[in-house]
Amino acid sequence: MHIVSLALGGCLKAEPVRYGITEDTGGHITYIRGEMDALARRDDVTLAEIVTRRFDDPRLGAAHALEEEWVAPKLLIRRIDSGDRRYLAKEALSADREGVTRAFIADLRRRERLPDVIHAHFADAAVLARAAQAEFGIEWTYTSHSLALQKAGAADCPQLQVRIR
């Protein structure tokens, strides 16, 4: 089975991850890396692939500009290029939604073999997963990671309220 874990926000890379380097580089990255590492060790999984957004920002590390980063023999981080190579925080990702969706569909179209299932993390990735299902019939599942539940009452901060919405 070929499984894609789709997560667009934060600085997702092989270890060592610099947690906290951006406001979006936190616990969900640990979850995704752990999930996919465990799946890659299974005999019935041929490829555990993390798909994220490609960007080029020297302050955040050169790895994020790489198209592919092999973490283990069956664990790959693939970065899709929407044409906007800036790092975008969660609240700014919606401006790149069309571009990253087009890039993801184009990436899938070029493949010899499509993934069997997509696991989308957060609503922005669910948009891409729905597009892949519409185009190719790929089944998908979704994890919201409870940002709003954990942080809604934590602070009276307009930027945080935008992120939660």
What kind of region is each of these model predictions?
Residues 1-165:
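Catalytic cores of nucleotide-sugar-dependent glycosyltransferases that transfer UDP/GDP/TDP-activated
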